[in-house]
């Protein structure tokens, strides 16, 4: 089984490519360095939850897209934490 960081990184790279963005462009949109984005995409670094939310909003995808169904308990714990998060109505 592949590491969850690698899977998430591949999904981010896929989204970036399908939307015609360079690492420099997406890194700027996410507020991270180009090097950090590259580390996320390669699965070297764990992605911060705030960056996950930005990716979801930028590409209009669900967390299930980034964290696909796997047998990994870590994935299930991440997904369950999002179930109870809803946007605040101001």
Segments from the language model and where they lie:
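Conserved hydrophobic/aromatic packing and binding residues within compact polymer-binding modules
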Residues: 12, 26-27, 37-40, 66
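Helix-turn-helix DNA-binding elements, focusing on the entry/boundary residues of the two helices
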Residues: 12, 23, 34, 49-52
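Short, charged recognition helix plus adjacent turn
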Residues: 68-90
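Short amphipathic helical patch at the helix-1/turn junction of helix-turn-helix
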Residues: 6, 17-18, 46
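Recognition helix of helix-turn-helix/homeodomain-like DNA-binding domains
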Residues: 30-46
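A detector for short, charged/polar N-terminal pre-domain segments
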Residues: 1-7, 75
